[in-house]
Structures are given as C-alpha cells and as structure tokens.
Amino acid sequence: MKLSPLKIDNLKASLPIIQGGMGVGISLSKLAGAVASCGGIGTISAAHPGYLEPDFETNPLEANIRALKHHVKEALKKAKDGLVAVNVMVASNDYEELVKASVESGANLIISGAGLPMSLPELCKGTATKIAPIVSSSKVCSLILKMWDKRHGATADAVVFEGPDAGGHLGFKLEDIDKSREGFYDEIGKIIESIKPYEEKYNKEIPLIVAGGIYSGKDIAKVLKLGAKGVQMGTRFVATNECDASEEFKMAYVNSTKEDIGLVKSPVGLPGRGIRNTFAKRIEVSNDPIRKCYNCIGKCPKKDIPYCISCSLIDSVKGETENSLVFCGSNAYKIDKIVPVKSLIEELVSEVEKE
C-alpha cells in the first residue's frame, strides 16, 4: 500500500502521520520539528510547555505562553516546509490564551480535546490556522460539528478520532472502555458518515485522523483501508532521540512489560493509561500531599484529589519515573530501543508499503 499525502484544507503533509501532542514537556519543538521535517505533522503539547522557565513557579501562565510561542517558532524553523500543530486541552483554565498564543506564533493546526472545543472556531476565525477536534465516537463528532455549524457557521478542517488504547487521559467512561475497544474499527466508518453532511455543506474534504493504539505500519494500513486519511501516534515517538523528555522517561517505555501498562487514577475525573509503577499503585490506596497548585484544570476538586497531576507529570518528564505519573499507550511495552525520528518514520512507511 502506498501512502498518500495528508491534505487539511489548503495544507499538505507529505506523509499522513501526525505525532500526537504529549504533555507535560514530552513533545515540544525538538520532537515536533523533527517529525515535521520528515514529512509528518509534528505536534507541541500546550500542557505546561514553560515548566523549565525560571518564573514558572510564580507566573505559570506567562511562562507557558512565552515558552509555547518559542517552541512553535522553533519547531517551524526545524520543519522547513513541514507542518506544526499544537494540542490544547479544553479542560485547561488557560484554554483561550493558549489557543491565541499558538495562532499568533504561526501554528498550522490546533488539535483540541479533553472536553468539547466549542469556542475553537471563534478563537481561530480569520487566521490561517486550521482546527481539528478530538472525538471519542461518532456521537461526539456529530455534536461538535452540529454546534460549530450552528454557533459559528464553521466546520472542522480535520477530525481526530482517539480510541481507548491511547495513552494519557481517555475520552471514555471506565465501564465503557472494553466495549469501545471492541467497536473501534466499526466506529471509524460511523464517524466518516457523520462528517459527510458538513463536507457537502462547506464544500470541502474533512479528513479523519485515527489515533489510539496505532503502533506499526500494519496498524496504519488497516485504518487507512477503512477510510481514514491519516493517523496520530504518540507512544512510538517517545522512544526517539529527538523526544523532549528525559532519557529516564524514554527508558521507562523501553523497560516496560505488557503487565506494567494499565489504567491509572487521575484527579481530572477521566481514566488514564500509563505505567503502573510504584506511584500508580500507591495513589490507589492513599493520597499524595499537594505541594503546589498551578490552577491548571477548571474542574479540579482541589481538596479531594489524590495528587496534583501537574506536579507529577513535571516530575516524570524530568526523570523521576518510579514515583510519578508516566502516561503511555497500550503498546508501549513493544518498544525495545530509542531511535532517530527519521529511522522510525522510514520503518513505518516501509511496513505500510508491504501491506
């Protein structure tokens, strides 16, 4: 099977592979720029990109906005003619500011989930930045596109369907994960059908990008044959030389086993997937003291949470991978080495071409 370019409105990536946004600090300009320069779409996570800034503890919003703008511009430089996206979580208290900063910096695309991105069309109106909601089902996709059409007279430039095998927070209720996994491939066709009325109304193609558990070229080929136009992959890109995380974080993936990976407790009210390390097991039975609040998530029940997710993710990206939260996709245990981004992409393309 030969890979076709991924077209998102008037943008074109030579490869239909989006590197997923991973925070805190896992996918910044180094990784996103490398992926974009190889023909994919590199994605910067807007979740605390300024965690290394000197004023982050005292002025987290200013530090994050400054760092986000820096990383978008740096990634675009590295990308040459490639495309750079930013992943912004709707759940963030600073959602509007982060989207605007991404647009001002020249991001080609905003990918937005962890909630319904109802205001995204208005925030990007009149700019060259394209918009793509993350959805967990055809029902959610229909709801978002219907509301965008009704409220903003606009539609998506692409749609990302993220299945239950993804890493990080999942857009599913805990009791629905197994059922959603069983219906994952059938849901692709349903989402494509839910997009069609808006393609016709707005006279444009709205490509579906499939994410969640996509590991190999075989996986890529399977979803493309079902009608998807591209894939989004996060976990594979962690184990690359260019990934912005610490070597200790990358090696946590390399050293993981299938039994190590499972659902982990999160204070944001959604199930998450990661490595069930000492930390993950501990917080199931006791709470970690909250040493700092960054006021990052709107619905965070601060008095009742088992731990601060920002603090834990910052600890893990810096290398404390046994006593902090390490998110990963369901197939992370298959990774056995760290490779250059270019080599990984060449491997994936070669595998697809054999299908």
Where are these regions (language model features)?
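Residue-level detector of alpha-helix initiation sites
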Residues: I26, I214-Y215
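Active-site entrance/lid segments in N-terminal catalytic domains of soluble metabolic enzymes
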Residues: M1-K201
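Conserved active-site-proximal phosphate/metal-binding subdomains
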Residues: I18, A166-I209, Y215-E355
